[in-house]
């Protein structure tokens, strides 16, 4: 399902087709999320740690980059887990309806 579907069209799909659309959207979102993460880490850690660009990294720059990436990943994981938990709580409190598409998978 490469084309964009509006809500009315999605409602007309079978539950299996809805799950397929949702799965595709989740995969695209995960890929975009990973690309954004790599871009953010590269920009932030490079700007912070590499003070004198050259043909190789100094040992202090390597250590700084490693610590920066580790902290960034830890923070990103914490934020992701917190967001996922909140989405799951919202889904549970709203009766578990997946955005009006029935009992299919959620976007959490």
UniProtKB/Swiss-Prot annotation:
Work out whether the entry's keyword set contains Cell membrane. Answer: no
- Pfam family example for this protein? zf-Tim10_DDP
Q: Which GO terms describe its biological process?
A: protein insertion into mitochondrial inner membrane
Q: Which GO terms describe its cellular component?
A: mitochondrial inner membrane; mitochondrial intermembrane space protein transporter complex
User: What compartments host this protein?
Assistant: Mitochondrion inner membrane
InterPro entries documented for this protein: Tim10-like, Tim10-like_dom_sf
- Chaperone listed as a keyword: yes
Name-wise, this protein is Mitochondrial import inner membrane translocase subunit tim-13
Q: Which organism is it from?
A: Caenorhabditis elegans
């Amino acid at each position: 399902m490469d084309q964009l579907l509006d809500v009315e069209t999605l409602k007309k799909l079978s539950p299996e087709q809805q799950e397929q659309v949702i799965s595709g959207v989740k995969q695209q979102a995960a890929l975009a999320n990973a690309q954004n993460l790599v871009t953010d880490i590269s920009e932030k850690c490079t700007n912070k740690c590499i003070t004198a660009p050259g043909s190789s990294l100094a040992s202090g720059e390597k250590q700084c980059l490693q610590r920066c990436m580790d902290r960034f990943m830890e923070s990103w994981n914490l934020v992701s887990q917190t967001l996922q938990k909140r989405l799951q709580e919202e889904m549970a409190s709203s009766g578990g309806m997946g955005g009006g598409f029935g009992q299919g998978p959620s976007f959490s």
